Amino acid sequence: MSSIVDVIAREILDSRGNPTVECDVWLDSGVMGRAAVPSGASTGEKEALELRDGDARRYLGKGVLKAVEHVNNEICEALIGLDPTDQAYIDQTLLELDGTDNKGSLGANAILAVSVAVAKAAALEVGLPLYRYLGGSGPMSLPVPMMNVINGGAHANNTLDIQEFMIMPVGARSFREALRCGAEIFHTLKKICADKGYSTAVGDEGGFAPNLARNEDAIKLILEATDKAGYVPGEDVLIALDCASSEFYKDGKYHLAGENLALSSEEFTNYLATLCDNYPIISIEDGMSEHDWAGWKLLTDKLGDKVQLVGDDVFVTNPAILAEGIKQGICNSLLVKINQIGSLSETLKAVDLAKRSGYTSVMSHRSGETEDSTIADLAVATNCMQIKTGSLSRSDRMAKYNQLLRIEEELGSAASYPGRAAFYHLK
């Protein structure tokens, strides 16, 4: 087996024009694996540390040259000569080299770029696509996409408090059909927004950001577009929300500024339950703040049997925090963001824990993305059956969808599309 002979990092730009880390891992066979890491806008407080330079003279302080230097020096020295197929040992070496709980010494952006690049190099070395290298042989599920078509909150400059309003094409028979369904609804929604005088500019994740009065109005707009595109809401297409509630949770209340409301945890639970009663909502992400575990318990007890409740900020893809959440009975699903935890091995460990505990997993992008399509392969490799990677515009989002099209084609009869079966944990 080949060994690692060089590790090279560089500073590149993400989809928001901010610096991020890209890494090349070279093997003595001449094979090279490359990975670039994403960056979030609304972030959980317990996420692994993304190392920035803080030099206001470069990129307004957001440069990542320190992280790049860590890769090119001490990380490179530590990995030369190692077997790239021993992912667990590679990642453990990186964690020990960093020596902190939050990867604050080397930077999670440095560690993750190397971790994923090693896996890509190893996959190339053994002649397998990444999803097969990590996921093994046999049948595989393509993920049902959560397509973010209307943006609010931290992702938009409008009055909507809920951050993401998404469509899930559960009635499709294949991923290819699901993507077509989403694209047709997206373009229909664009025309409806234009006809109503709303802006059709798109946000960080490719969705529209109309200046609507109430969160409910965004759902109504999506249902109108779904119907006009020729699909049946509640049958062909379901709605998913990302509340990003930590962003508007202050002093023990959920402040929906756009609707002039300040709600207790119980009141906000009832607010969300009413939306679910009135509309075909199948999934709610970050329905409560990461600091409000009691609120999460209320929400889970009320809706957990019939709605997927996804923990993002509250779990930050951290196996230890997820284990505590499972013990306390909060949420029933894990959002998986590889840069929240900062290594491939820890990401896979979190997904495995969720699966063994009866929780679903949703593979996810970040609002600041690159052309790297690793999460598409990870979604298939882990059979998590759901992916969240933006709207039907912006090439940084389409890179993931297009990779999934290729994977479905490569798998042929070994590929399945789960549709509603992705929510196997609901009654």
Curated annotation (Swiss-Prot):
Provide GO CC annotations from the record: cell surface; extracellular region; phosphopyruvate hydratase complex
A GO molecular function term, named singly, is: phosphopyruvate hydratase activity
Pathway as given in its UniProt record: Carbohydrate degradation; glycolysis; pyruvate from D-glyceraldehyde 3-phosphate: step 4/5
Q: What's its top-level EC category?
A: lyase
Residues engaged in binding (2R)-2-phosphoglycerate:
Q163, K337, R366, S367, K388
Q: Which UniProt keywords apply?
A: Cytoplasm, Glycolysis, Lyase, Magnesium, Metal-binding, Secreted
Q: Report the active site residues.
A: E205 (proton donor), K337 (proton acceptor)
Q: Mind telling me which InterPro entries this protein's record contains?
A: Enolase, Enolase-like_C_sf, Enolase-like_N, Enolase_C, Enolase_CS, Enolase_N
Against SUPFAM superfamilies, the record matches this protein to: Enolase C-terminal domain-like (SSF51604), Enolase N-terminal domain-like (SSF54826)
* EC number(s) from the headed UniProt entry: 4.2.1.11
According to its UniProt entry, one GO biological process term is: glycolytic process
Protein's cellular compartments: Cytoplasm; Secreted; Cell surface
Cite the HAMAP family for this sequence: Enolase
Query: How is this protein named in the record?
Result: Enolase
> What's the name of its gene?
eno
